[in-house]
């Protein structure tokens, strides 16, 4: 089977794929254009794409050889799944591959913002740090604050667990459907306005796509308190 992998992977993953398939691994950092996606599906039995590769409706043309798009990542909004199905091409994804890593990054961003870590690093790299001062780069506490999770899916739950168990934070969340049987205390709120007005930190953990585009705009930002972060 001929397989195209659209980005570099870890050495172990590349070795495993090459040992099993006739594998071509693209050495690039930008995504495939629609024309390149169409050409890949015409030449290969399977393609392993990821975010940024444009498998939009126009890429699914007559006479394609490809029968599988094995997406690397949970999100697949860069693939027109309806067009793929019409062309007889199966689409798979990896729902839990990056759940924990994404939640770690969310907590990293919360801590960096609250404790002004980015500012401190830039100060140090500029050679301007002259020693500790009582009021230097004062941030705010994270422990005991309220976090609002927008989207309580796998990633949202992983973020909420870290916030509650790691920092004793109160957890609010907004989700399009009712979420129950959580293994940590949390309160679901009906609207974004209610969540944002009560949150010290708000985290967006929803899939990308037309349904969530512009979810956060001027109105939502104005609901945040003067010392809140999103």
Segments (PLM) and residue ranges:
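Phosphate-binding beta-alpha-beta segment of Rossmann-like dinucleotide-binding domains, i.e.
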Residues: 87, 95-146, 158-166
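An N-terminal-biased, well-structured beta-alpha scaffold segment characteristic
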Residues: 1-92, 197, 217
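Rossmann-like dinucleotide/phosphate-binding beta-alpha-beta segment
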Residues: 135-226
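Short, flexible loop segments at the rims of nucleotide/cofactor-binding pockets, characterized by
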Residues: 23-30, 46-49, 126, 178-185, ...
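Residues at secondary-structure transition points
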Residues: 32-35, 50, 71, 93-104, ...
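Rossmann-fold dehydrogenase core element
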Residues: 85-97, 225-229
